């Protein structure tokens, strides 16, 4: 078989497989498990951000394909590899239901040792984040997405950690981004994946 054909086949296989490195050159998480869209009651994301749609959202440990019953519908956790530094929920799930909705994104982060780092993130619109089941971030207003809008010091423990984001969209874009920094630079000695160990 010609080398170019082999390369093309391999590139297709790799493109469809979640990468274990999981982050881009700037450290932004590119591989996630995503669950969406979940309809919210009313039009206030500031109120709905505190609603636990999963009955234990802080401590979820999903696997790809795992189904969840939410608001009378069955949704499955789907692997999502972003095409840019941010998750675009509308790109993932289409625009048929992209306003007044909530979504979750999960990344598994493996650290070689305990380390204190900075979690830099942003959401459009409202957002919450948990690391290993502990709340580390909340934003309850509307906004557009920018890199590193919010920063919080967190501790990654040796082994696999879990980052859970919840993002609510009222109207227009529905996005989020996150990365881990140390002294302002991306943390390089961690592995990020959408696969639970």
Annotate each language-model stretch with its function.
Residues 128-179:
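Beta-strand-rich ligand-recognition modules
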Residues 111, 116-130, 163:
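Aromatic-lined ligand-binding clefts that engage carbohydrates, nucleic acids, or primary amines
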Residues 105-117, 153-158:
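Extracellular and analogous surface-interaction loops
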Residues 4-15:
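Bacterial N-terminal signal peptides
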Residues 18-87, 165-197:
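Accessory carbohydrate-binding/adhesion or oligomerization-edge regions at the termini
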Residues 92-103, 140-145:
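Extracellular beta-rich ligand/substrate-recognition surface
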Residues 101-103, 113, 123, 146-148:
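Residues that act as N-cap/strand-start positions at coil-to-secondary-structure junctions
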